[in-house]
Regions:
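Gly/Pro-enriched, hydrophobic low-complexity segments
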Residues: 144-242
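Flexible, processing/modification-adjacent segments and terminal tails
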Residues: 21-25, 90-157, 181-184, 238, ...
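Short, hydrophobic/aromatic-rich segments at coil-to-beta transitions
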Residues: 42-48, 63-69, 140-147, 174-176, ...
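N-terminal leader/targeting segments and the immediate start of mature chains
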Residues: 15-53
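Positively charged n-region of N-terminal signal peptides that target proteins for export
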Residues: 1-4, 18
Length: 246
């Protein structure tokens, strides 16, 4: 009996050690992160929410998605509609004629808000390239650090931007993200997720949005800068009145 007990304890310790040393690819980590955030529940659902002074609506996923933004402008109702093939703006129900550059700016603005709200779901899009980097410790917790770049084909207007995601090793939840951008002089942003809530099985978070205090910060070392307190809070990204309909 004593030998059996010792064998049982040994097997248990071995199992824990193997689990602790279990390794995953970038794809496997992202798949788990998407799964814990709602997975296929994103498909074919109608999602609406308020962000700042605008109302957003999305129906469908991927190439079949229709993304909307509705807001008041000087007493007039503005409705922006982005689909796979076009972008349209209606003002009080009348279609506006827009220059291509203006339409592209509006299109990107609508897409960006919807994209961040649904993260990490979009990380399995065909144009996304994922690389697993060295694991890091942030605020006492261990994280997988994943670098994301985009192919020019299918990567959108901002395909040259680079993203980093910090996915918790225990929960597989995306707690931090960062990205660089090249418009308006360029820069780097670092976001910390908070106020997690699940609505009909889908995970939603708000973000604290940070920027570097000096020019020595890059997207590669932004996590170390955050750990040292060398970032400053720029804004908060808060979602309100979230609704999920199947």
């Amino acid at each position: 009996m004593k030998k059996m007990f010792i064998l049982f304890v040994f097997c248990g310790l071995l199992s824990c050690k193997e689990k602790k040393n279990e390794s995953f690819t970038a794809q496997q980590i992202v798949d788990k992160a998407i799964g814990i955030s709602g997975g296929d529940l994103f498909v074919d659902c109608k999602l609406s929410f308020d962000f700042r002074d605008k109302h957003y609506i999305s129906e469908g996923i991927g190439n079949n998605a229709v993304l909307k933004r509705v807001f008041d402008l000087e007493g007039k109702k503005v409705e922006d509609i982005k689909s796979k093939s076009k972008f349209e703006r209606y003002v009080d129900g009348t279609l506006e004629v827009l220059q291509d550059t203006v339409a592209n700016n509006y299109d990107n603005s609508v897409n960006s808000v919807h994209y961040f709200v649904k993260l990490p779901y979009g990380l399995n899009d065909p144009a996304v390239n994922k690389t697993l980097l060295k694991e890091v410790n942030l605020k006492g917790k261990e994280y997988y650090k994943i670098k994301v770049t985009f192919d020019q084909k299918g990567g959108g207007e901002d395909f040259e931007d680079t993203y980093f995601y910090w996915i918790n090793k225990e929960s597989f939840k995306t707690d931090y993200l960062a990205y660089d951008f090249h418009v308006d002089g360029g820069g780097v942003r670092f976001r910390k997720a908070y106020n997690e809530r699940y609505i009909k099985g889908i995970r939603f978070v708000d973000y604290e949005n940070y920027q570097p205090k000096d020019s020595t910060s890059t997207i590669e070392n932004i996590d170390a800068k955050f750990e040292l307190g060398d970032l400053e809070l720029l804004s908060k990204i808060e979602l309100k009145n979230i609704s999920v309909q199947k």
